[in-house]
Swiss-Prot record:
NCBIfam families the UniProt entry points to: fabZ, PRK00006.1
Domain of life: Bacteria
Name of the featured protein: 3-hydroxyacyl-[acyl-carrier-protein] dehydratase FabZ
PANTHER family: 3-HYDROXYACYL-[ACYL-CARRIER-PROTEIN] DEHYDRATASE (PTHR30272:SF1)
Function per UniProt: Involved in unsaturated fatty acids biosynthesis. Catalyzes the dehydration of short chain beta-hydroxyacyl-ACPs and long chain saturated and unsaturated beta-hydroxyacyl-ACPs.
Organism, as annotated: Bacillus licheniformis (strain ATCC 14580 / DSM 13 / JCM 2505 / CCUG 7422 / NBRC 12200 / NCIMB 9375 / NCTC 10341 / NRRL NRS-1264 / Gibson 46)
Keywords, in A-Z order: Cytoplasm, Lipid A biosynthesis, Lipid biosynthesis, Lipid metabolism, Lyase
Keyword Lipid biosynthesis assigned: yes
GO MF entry, a single one: (3R)-hydroxyacyl-[acyl-carrier-protein] dehydratase activity
Family: Belongs to the thioester dehydratase family. FabZ subfamily.
Entry's localization field: Cytoplasm
Major subcellular site: cytoplasm
Enzyme Commission no: 4.2.1.59
Keyword Lipid biosynthesis attached: yes
């Protein structure tokens, strides 16, 4: 299990854009699972929506990508690299995510060749699917 500090040692995201609180399972290069505790204090709720707070769907997809990035970047040969979105396919939002929800995140790498890959992500709240998507990614080097 990885806590937020350990996650920050693997991926470069920081508040307010680190969207994973814990990683509970990792198979390096293959899959990862974790969660985000969604609180009323999230920055995005200030504008989405003030009187009816709902987590933006694109941030649910980003949280899935961050869990997947942990799986990829934990592999020794990928340490220190960055994972970038290359595309999103078959994305569906099934339920709203609201303050107080624990967003469970899982991403399985379907294929990875060279520096390009694809993964299948599923996000759930209370065992019910709230989002599914296929995410394409590219691993790159940090540019100075």
């Amino acid at each position: 299990m990885l806590d937020a500090q350990q996650i920050k040692e693997i991926i470069p995201h920081r508040y307010p854009f680190l969207l994973v609180d814990r990683v509970t399972e990792v198979e390096e290069g293959k899959r990862a699972a974790g969660y985000k505790n969604v609180t009323v204090n999230e920055e995005f709720f200030n504008g989405h929506f003030p009187d009816y707070p709902v987590m933006p769907g694109v941030l649910i997809v980003e949280a899935l990508a961050q869990v997947g990035a942990v799986a990829l970047l934990m592999k020794e040969e990928n340490r220190g690299r960055l994972a970038f979105f290359a595309g999103i396919d078959s994305c569906r939002f099934k339920k709203q995510v609201k303050p107080g929800d624990q967003l469970h995140l899982e991403l399985e790498v379907l294929r990875f060749r060279g520096s390009i890959g694809k993964g299948k992500g599923v996000a759930k709240v209370d065992g019910e699917v709230v989002c599914e998507a296929e995410l394409m990614f590219s691993l790159g080097e940090k540019q100075e």
